[in-house]
Amino acid sequence: MHSRHDEYHKLTRGERIGYGMGDFAQNLVFGTIGGFLALHMLTVNTISTATAGFIFLFVRIINVFWDPMVGTYVDKRTSKAGKYRPWLLRAGVPLVILSALLFAPIPGVKGSVAFAFIIYLALDLVYSLVNIPYGSLNASLTRDPESIDKLTSTRMMLANSANLLVYTLFPMFVQMAAPKDRSLKDTGFFGLELNLGNYTDPSANYAWFGVYAIYMIIGAVALFICYKFTKERVVATAEQTANVKTTDLFHELRHNRPLVILGMFFMLAFTFMFFMNTVNGFFNQFVVSHSEWMGAVGLVASIPGIAFPVFWPKLKKIFGKKGFFHLFLAMFIVGELLTYVWSREGMHDALWLAYIATFIKQWGLTSATGFMWALVPEVIAYGELKSGKRNAAIINAIMGLFFKIGFTIGGAIPLWLLAVYGFNESGAMQSASAIDGIIMTAVWIPIALAAISMVIIQVYPISDKHVTDINRQLDEIRV
């Protein structure tokens, strides 16, 4: 039986890194899917824009029913290795295999809507079996608030290290392996020139798969490290576990107001994040015509997410929880406005502007969307105080639903907007209308959603003092 002292365990650096490897793995696997699958589907796999959008939408609708079942199933069961940890291995291996299949150049299925749909659906269902237990594991490591803040900083540093591999190096590696239209190009890495090919041509299919397969091997190793170096301490009692029901989801939604508010913030944050990520490749390829810069610009943009999370706990103390989010959401908006300046005629070749705009934008984005995960354990504790049940997996399933709704909106609607604006999947050049559509989805819609997010987080009710009071009351109840 776990002691109260064990529940307030001060996490070591090794434990924080071990858990953070789970974020590293999932960003490597699913971040690449979110950032580049649409581009691959449309240009290399030659699936139409509208069809790809409907694939993303339909799979997310299924998630609405699937995720609560996963949350309930996980919360009702435990094993010798723990309640949540085993799923990192049980579902982790199928996750990386299915992910690789989405980019696999299999003869006879190129352009097959049925194949793309089935594999993407299976991948998304399996992803829930990894992501929901992983999110629940976060709240079971410790109840110490200081350790939770430090854990959030560490895991986001590792998550953004994976983003460096995804958004910075992945497109460059694929272009290095792409066979068509190869030429020596300035990468923007301080004069570094590389022989790069056209990665949006169907002939680049083996290049995509080869690079992604290597990423999946790294992701599988990272999931194993996460499993090996984590320990569950804050766990539900046997009575709480036995009493878990699927209807607990509706109870949490009705009575856990902080959960609903945080969920809405998650939904909006992931919506504007994936609006931007979905069309990032299109923006670089067709608006500013500098896809060869994606590696260099992405490298500069990755610095805030890797180097600065260590300062998050201190900044939260200075500005407060809500002030922290307001500061970095405002910074994101400023970066987006500078991105719009970069998109204007005559500014496309301004590499310095690309660096500054993306650096500021990503600093705001990674901080606001990274630190929000630190609020999930306190929402779980609040729910336990109100209901008497520690429904960690169910609450993480609810959070997963919110962020997947955002992921869906941010992944599907941009593609439909591009179709409305006249995007040509096979065209090397795009019309002025299509360019306007890319800018709308990459800049203006994310700005509007970020502004709404600032309003949502303002009404979030749990302060740091409330967290201390909640933990004290839970201690008294358990004693």
Indicate residue ranges for each PLM-predicted region:
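Membrane-embedded alpha-helical bundles of multi-pass transporters/translocases
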Residues: 2-479
